Amino acid sequence: ADKLYKLGYKNVVVYAGGLPEWKKQSLPTTAGAKKVDTVKKEQKPEFSKNGAKLGKDEGSIDGEWLKALIIDNKVPEYIQIVNVLPAKEFKKGNIKGSINIETDKLSAKEIVSKLPKNKTIIFNCSAGARSIEAWMKLKKDGIDVSEIFYFDANINCKDNNCKIEVNEPLE
């Protein structure tokens, strides 16, 4: 306090608890300082409206969640897995219960017309890239993709026996 008087300050007050106690009470340490309210980041939902567990990347499904369902043969009825590969590749092996719609040469509207209605759609391919492309094609064309997702994974199937390695999220 004496130093402040020597510097010319006139209205000097001493807080008995000292600075550590002052800070503990979350009180400002300068006249201009105001407590900053932290802005909460918008919470991303964990599940889709129908109950599919969402991945970290936009449009993705949680890969480990879906992999476990596929391996345990417990993919829910509300989910339709859509293999986007050419029919020739699909016939070599695919995820049990999946259907094949080769999306590469189709427009977004043509893809949607072939998708089952009232289902959560999950696109898959052999490495993730073509399923992402199919999803992006729909999104770019303004299609509602709130229940359409992609499975970002390396998938190698012989008949219905599949080895699945989930790719790391980009986020």
Task: List each model region and its residues.
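Rhodanese-like catalytic fold shared by cysteine-dependent sulfurtransferases
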Residues: 1-77, 87-120, 129-171
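Short cysteine clusters
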Residues: 125
